[in-house]
């Protein structure tokens, strides 16, 4: 394990997800015993609150927290970073149309993409958690032409984890018994959680469940709309679970997915499974040494095909919308 601190940037660091994420990062959930240097970006009005969060980080006396830098200037914060977790995004407010949301976030992720392109470390990897995550990642990637496209990913690990949890609850299996879960498409209500290639204790998950109606009518909508259900229950969006999934995704990306298993990541499509090239869409991937590879050769039946196509059509619509706005 290297003793050189890994420089990790977090945007929206004073927000709800940031508050859950920073203490996990500082305590070693991502890097274990390797030192970490946190670079925290916020908008100017939130810097005071962020100072309070840093006071709390100091008060934890984390042994592997090598340093914390905060600021509102992306180029300063991103300078030399090895990992950028783009959590901050403009939430959808009352009366906002989808185009308004894409436009507001487009400005944020255009600027951040350009800053990363200019000053990030040569080995940088960029994970986008802020929604709409897939299209925000596409905007950042397009504005960072010198960074390899494979270094950008959007978070669908939260959906992946939600799907595993629902399947475990249904079957009585432990979450550790469930392998090869896949989320296809967009991190939105059109996403497709696919149990037909998943395994529970080595057996096909759909066969173990043995209830196609439950898969279609309960499982898929529960996973796809889980975020809305959490807002309804707690009055604000899922933050701790999103932070946890952000760590899971980054850890597997940097250190590799488990043998005989795969994970879900939204990455740039090479045309696999009929997903239009260049879209940032969720796929089953294996990871090793900081690189990912789309799992090939999975049979896609008509039911799955229709679900994947519906979600990728939404992604194509979003790409068209941000093109019209001049963001890519």
Curated annotation (Swiss-Prot):
Keywords: NAD, Oxidoreductase, Tricarboxylic acid cycle. It comes from the Bacteria. Signal peptide: none annotated. Substrate binds at residues 92, 98, 131, 162. PROSITE patterns: MDH. Pfam families: Ldh_1_C, Ldh_1_N. The keyword Iron does not apply. One of its GO terms (biological process) is malate metabolic process. It catalyses: (S)-malate + NAD(+) = oxaloacetate + NADH + H(+). InterPro entries: L-lactate/malate_DH, Lactate/malate_DH_C, Lactate/malate_DH_N, Lactate_DH/Glyco_Ohase_4_C, Malate_DH_AS, Malate_DH_type2, NAD(P)-bd_dom_sf. GO terms for molecular function: L-malate dehydrogenase (NAD+) activity. Disulfide bonds: none annotated. PANTHER family: MALATE DEHYDROGENASE (PTHR23382). Catalyzes the reversible oxidation of malate to oxaloacetate. Belongs to the LDH/MDH superfamily. MDH type 2 family. This is Malate dehydrogenase. The gene is mdh.
